[in-house]
Amino acid sequence: MYLGLDIGRQYVKMVTAEKTKTGYKVIDAGCRLVPEQNATYDPEKIDHSHWVMAVKELFRQQGFNPRKAKGLITGINGSSASIKQITTMEMPSDELESAMTFEARKHIPMDGTDAVIDYQILGSNKKEVDKIDVGLVACTKGVLNNHIDLLKECGLKPGIVDVNPIAMSNAFSFAKDIPDDGLVVMLDIGAVSSTLVVYGKGEQFFTRDLPIGGHHFVKELSEKKEIGYIEAQDLLFKDGLSASKSDSASDSMNEVGIAERTVYDNLIEDMRRSLRFYAKQTGQSFFLKIFLTGGAAGTPGLSEVVKDKLNIECAVFDPFDSMDGADDVSISNPSQYTTALGLGIRGGMDLG
């Protein structure tokens, strides 16, 4: 049994899964709020002690003893790591490692500690002879040590440390067939940021962190309606994007003038820019569908607005769809477990 543990800014999520002859079977899934219940969420006030308490409470809530797991797999957020697909000359392995370390330093925010890298040769480059494509993942020792210290504070024995964007894509690849042509886009909407992932068969893997998350959805609604954070959160969960619509005559008059940009407009514009950048860099722009994951993915009306504004099919992704054992797991928001499931699957890939 593999334990995928996703330690988010607002929720910690866990998925336990077993490897079977045909794939994986989900055993359990659960989540726990990191801040205090019924308190205004302030991401700046969340520290190690909150995460430690939330992880321990989550295990207690699920009646789970982490020592029973064959392996613990956790992830580092995309904003704290760099994931790049590099095209380089073929070279001996020791030279390639030096080249990748040099490359990593250009892409990760250095904090005075050394870079930690992992890379995999993906194959020959389709366009340039004598060149290879290499998948590079990097973070700093400071980031990695901070993550491992947190796990130890939770009483856990650190195992495999993955990066969340790759965990997302592993969960998707397990649940869906990747088309031979075209690109899949995933948007994981976290509390304070979102992670965009673009990939396809034989195509360049791309990820970008966007500085907008579910917390900003709630905050904007709270300010616009002049209501408390918790009330705004409940209203958003119930009514979705329609909750932001003006309901007074004065607001209606203001709408005749310059339309006010919303947090959703900003998020979609960030997505548009990222997809344009990908198309410009790769020459590929056949985006088949956008899949929304994460805690705020199911916000009513969001997938429809993304589809209308970007003119690309959009849907909320359910990582447990048609998965063995899913019917026996009681959860209310499947999409928020995408990363945790992907982490568990990584355990089966490496430890199975």
Briefly describe each language-model feature range:
Residues 1-103, 145-147, 155-157:
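Non-catalytic, solvent-exposed interaction/assembly segments
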Residues 1-33, 70-77, 175-206, 210-216, ...:
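Gly/Thr-rich phosphate-binding beta-strand-loop-beta motif of the actin/hexokinase/Hsp70
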Residues 285-315:
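Glycine-rich phosphate-binding loops at beta-strand->alpha-helix junctions
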Residues 36-43, 142-170, 203-245:
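Glycine-rich phosphate-binding loop plus the immediately following alpha-helix
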Residues 224, 235-288, 296:
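Adenine-nucleotide phosphate-binding core of ATP-dependent small-molecule kinases
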Residues 297, 315-352:
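Glycine-rich phosphate-binding/hydrolytic loop that grips phosphoryl groups
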Residues 75-175, 289, 319-323:
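Active-site neighborhood for divalent-cation/phosphate handling
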